[in-house]
Amino acid sequence: MKLNKSTIEVLKNFAGINNGMVIHAGSRIRTQDNLNKQIAYADIEDSFPVEFAVYDLGEFLSALNLLDNAELDFQEKFVVVTGDGGTKLTFQYANAEFVTEAPEKVNFPTELDGGAEFDLKGEDLQRVKKASATLGLSDICVRTEAGSTAITLSATDAQGSSKHTFEINVGEADVDTEFKFFFKSERLNIVDQDYKVSIHPAGISRFLGLSLEYFIATEAL
């Protein structure tokens, strides 16, 4: 089989969450960081024929780039990758027992109880992430202010050590309520697409996209 570009994009993103990954047979993949702060699921265009694990997903993807028109043949203990010009790569699987694996599903609360919910456009997410990197800001904040229903997404420093901020209005709250939630910037390094964002005050959020779903912990200050 050949991997679609969209599948490779998701795998690269998941490698940023955890380099180790167990991939199950089928077209749904999942990963979790070692701190249990971020869990991600994706429905991909490709369907893997077997279950296998890798210690270093980034290394695996880089190895595939060594071959032109890579064709993958998944065996019991390794995958054989062939390419143009007679090139061949044999990549050994890892022991799945030593790789952090995400649960099959996350039970997200149905009631937000003072939390937040809004639609986030991919271009707005991309701009805030770029601002965070450009200005060296470690946090991303979702907030409203007293007397306003406007929801703001901003790149900032939760500890106040930087005076730089960058913010975008991303929607309106259903009611006039005040809230403020912080994320570590690196945890919002998710694939740029439109998401339905739900944040629960207990410290968990869900970013639901067309084919992607991320559960990300908010930060207690």
From Swiss-Prot:
Record keyword Chaperone present: no
Pfam families reported for this sequence: gp45-slide_C
InterPro entries tied to this protein? DNA_clamp_sf, Sliding_clamp_C, Sliding_clamp_T4
Q: Which GO terms describe its biological process?
A: DNA replication; viral DNA genome replication; viral transcription
Matching entries from Gene3D superfamilies are given as: 3.70.10.10
Keywords of this entry? DNA replication, Viral DNA replication, Viral transcription
Q: Which GO terms describe its molecular function?
A: DNA polymerase processivity factor activity
Q: What does this protein do?
A: Sliding clamp that encircles the genomic DNA and links the DNA polymerase to the template to control the processivity of DNA synthesis. Responsible for tethering the catalytic subunit of DNA polymerase to DNA during high-speed replication. Interaction with the sliding-clamp-loader opens the sliding clamp so that it can be loaded around the DNA template. During transcription, encircles the DNA and tethers host RNA polymerase (RNAP) to it.
Q: Which family does it belong to?
A: Belongs to the Tevenvirinae sliding clamp family.
Subunit info?
Homotrimer. Interacts with the viral DNA polymerase; this interaction constitutes the polymerase holoenzyme. Interacts with the sliding-clamp-loader; this interaction allows the sliding-clamp-loader to open the sliding clamp. Interacts with the viral DNA ligase. Part of the replicase complex that includes the DNA polymerase, the polymerase clamp, the clamp loader complex, the single-stranded DNA binding protein, the primase, the helicase and the helicase assembly factor. Interacts with the viral RNA polymerase (RNAP).
Q: What is this protein called?
A: Sliding clamp
UniProt organism field: Vibrio phage KVP40 (isolate Vibrio parahaemolyticus/Japan/Matsuzaki/1991) (KVP40)
Lineage runs: Viruses, Duplodnaviria, Heunggongvirae, Uroviricota, Caudoviricetes
